[in-house]
Every structure is written in structure tokens, then in C-alpha cells.
A protein has these predicted regions:
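Alpha-helical transmembrane segments of multi-pass membrane proteins
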Residues: 2-268
Length: 268
């Protein structure tokens, strides 16, 4: 009887150990996403401010800035999420995304400061199609930023039982960083540093995150003993075809419901 109780307690103890291990592993990645989220929302505040000067109407600038930014995040999550499953070194991909986002974010900020005259010229000739110019400028760096979370999740490769914990913690850290970025941009960076100085600060933050990610990649490779840090056997197991189809249906339903919820939230 005692032996049965002891054996029953083993899976529970193992689950607790795995959860504690996952929490420890999430420390640095969560910090990276916090800083990355801070930089991302600094850019967004700057771009909305600049777009209001370009298009001349605040509500249009806010709608264009938020719409283009979230379109980029969605495209980046879809594109780089698929790519992350194919690359051998997702940590390096994450570092490259952060570095490229910093360079492109700074470049777009400088470009938005110079497109007022071209925008007016285009609008007088092609009408509403002129809005594609600022839309594309904002969407491109946002696409890179949108790929950071799924790529980092792929780099961590949490156990199936810990994916909810890992995803929730990383998303929360990224959201908290976004809140910090919004407040810092509005109350500190823009008044003290101006638009270009604020964009440069955000780009530096992206660069620091990229450097830290490269160091974490080296540490992960050293611990695993291989450059790719091979995935655990539990993740390589292929589910039966019926289970895969059922999982795909649930995933599609979740995406639709999540999209509706996001649309309602941003509509308010």
C-alpha cells in the first residue's frame, strides 16, 4: 500500500520539478521580451505622433498607426512562427529579428519625418491609395517585432505540459514591457530626447536584446552539446492522423475566436 502511494506521488513530484525548472528557464527570455515590448511601443507612440502630422487628422493617424502595427504583428507571428519550426538555431533567428527591428524601426521613424510632402503629392494624384505609403512603412518593422514571441517560444522548447506556463509568462512580460514603453515614450523620451532621440533609444534597446540573445544561444548550445539543441523526444513523437486533424480543427477555432476577441477589444 505504501509502495503504491509512493509511486503515485512520483509523477506529481516530477511535474512540480519540471514546472520549477521551466520557471527558472523563463527568467532571461521574459526579461528580453519585456525590453523588446518596451522598444516596440516606443516606436508605435512615435509613429502615431508622426502620422498625425502627415495625414493631418488625429483619429485617422491613430487608426492607421494601430491598424498597421497590429497587421505587422499578425503577419510576423504567422510568417516567422512557421519559419521557426524549420530553423536549427531559433535563438540566432530571434537575435537577428531584434537587430533588424531596431535598424528598421529607426529608419522608419526618420522616413516618416520626411514623407509629409510626398504623401500630399500622392494623395492629390492617386487619392486614398496614397495611404499605402505610411501603411507599408509602419507594417514592415512591426512584422519583425511580431515574429519575436513565436521564435523565442521555439527556442525555449518547453515540454508539452509546460507550454501554457511558458506562453503565458512570456506574453505577460511582453505586455508589461509594452505598457512601460507607452508611458516612457509619452512622459520621458519624447519630452527629453525628441522623436529621433527616442527612436534611437528604442533601437539601442533592440540591439541590447539581440546581443543578450546571442549569448543565451551560446549557453544553450553548450548545455545541449549540439548547435541546434535537439528537441526533446516528447516533442518528436508524431500523433496519429485522427488526433492531428482534431487538433488542427481546435486550433482553427481558437484562432477565429481569438481574432474576434481582438477585434472587439481594439474596437473599443
Amino acid at each position: 500500500m505504501r509502495r503504491g502511494k509512493a509511486s503515485a506521488a512520483l509523477p506529481k513530484d516530477r511535474a512540480m520539478v519540471e514546472e520549477a525548472h521551466t520557471r527558472v528557464r523563463l527568467g532571461w527570455p521574459a526579461a528580453l521580451l519585456f525590453v523588446s515590448g518596451t522598444a516596440a511601443l516606443v516606436y508605435q507612440v512615435l509613429w502615431i505622433r508622426q502620422l498625425s502630422l502627415v495625414v493631418g487628422v488625429d483619429v485617422h493617424a491613430v487608426s492607421l498607426g494601430i491598424g498597421a502595427f497590429f497587421a505587422g504583428l499578425a503577419a510576423g507571428g504567422w510568417l516567422f512562427g512557421r519559419l521557426a519550426d524549420r530553423v536549427e538555431r531559433p535563438w540566432h533567428l530571434y537575435a537577428a529579428l531584434e537587430m533588424a527591428a531596431g535598424v528598421l524601426g529607426l529608419s522608419v521613424t526618420l522616413a516618416l519625418g520626411a514623407i509629409a510632402v510626398p504623401f500630399v503629392w500622392l494623395e492629390s494624384r492617386v487619392g486614398p491609395l496614397a495611404w499605402l505609403l505610411p501603411l507599408l512603412l509602419v507594417t514592415l518593422p512591426a512584422t519583425l517585432l511580431g515574429g519575436t514571441l513565436p521564435v523565442l517560444m521555439r527556442a525555449l522548447r518547453p515540454l508539452i505540459e509546460q507550454r501554457g506556463l511558458a506562453g503565458g509568462r512570456l506574453y505577460a512580460a511582453n505586455t508589461l514591457g509594452a505598457i512601460a514603453g507607452t508611458l516612457l515614450a509619452a512622459f520621458c523620451f519624447i519630452p527629453w530626447l525628441g522623436l529621433r532621440g527616442s527612436a534611437l533609444t528604442a533601437a539601442v534597446l533592440n540591439g541590447l536584446v539581440a546581443i543578450a540573445a546571442w549569448r543565451l544561444a551560446a549557453r544553450a548550445s553548450a548545455q545541449a552539446g549540439t548547435p541546434g539543441n535537439a528537441a526533446p523526444p516528447a516533442e518528436r513523437a508524431v500523433a496519429p492522423e485522427e488526433a492531428q486533424e482534431a487538433r488542427a480543427r481546435r486550433a482553427r477555432l481558437a484562432v477565429v475566436l481569438y481574432a474576434i476577441a481582438g477585434g472587439l477589444a481594439l474596437g473599443y
